[in-house]
Amino acid sequence: MALLGKAAVAMWWSVRPEQRSEFGDWHSHEHFPERMSIPGFRRGSRWTSTTDAEGFFVLYELEHYDVLTSKGYLDRLNAPTPWSTKMMPHHLGMIRSQCRIVASFGGGVATSLATIRLSPEAGRETALQARLSEVLDALARQPGLSGAHLLLTDTPRMSAPTTEQQIRGKDGAADWIVLLSGYDADVVERAVIAQLASSVLHAAGAQNRMTVGRYRLAFTMTPQDVAAI
C-alpha cells in the first residue's frame, strides 16, 4: 500500500483473549469512525499478529504532521467516549509512535504486513535512511509485495498527557519504523529474512536491536467510508 499523507500514528499493543470480541466491536464500529471523522485523518488500518495471539498493530495515516497537534485530534484524545474509557485500560504494553513519513513506495492495500522497529547508530542516520529508501523502493516493485515505507518518530511537544494516555498508563514509543506489505505472506517473510534481516540493516547503519512483527489485515477505514455510513 502507498501511505496517504505525510505523517502517521503507529501503535502496537496486546488485548487479552476475553476482551478481544468487545475490542473488535468497539474499535471497528465506534473508534475508527470517530478517528476518521477528524480533519486530516486519511486512513486507518488494524492488523492482527500472526505470531502473538494477543498482539495488534494499528496505523493511522495523516494528511500532514500538524494534524498530530490539531484541535480536532486533541479534543478527541481528551474527551474519550464512555466505551473508549472502558476499553482503554485493556490496551496492554502500548507502543505509540507519532511519525513523519520519510519514504513510501507502492500502492493499494494488501493483506500481509511486517513491521520492523529499529534505531540508527549514532552518526549513521543519513546513510541508513538513504540505504533503506533504496531497498524499500526496490522491494515495493517485487511480485507478492505491495508497499514499503519508512517512518521516523517525531513526538510533538505536549504540555501534559492526554486523557486517553492517563487512562492507559505510560505509553512507549518506537524510533524508526519499516513497514513492508504484500498480498503473499510468504514473499513478505522472505524479504524480511533476506533484504531486511538484522545483520543486513546493522551493516547499513542500524543498531543491532530490532523488533519484527508479522500481521494480517483485520479492518481498514477511510473518511469516505464514514461518510457512507
Regions found by a protein language model. Give the residues of each.
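Macromolecular interaction modules
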Residues: M1-I229
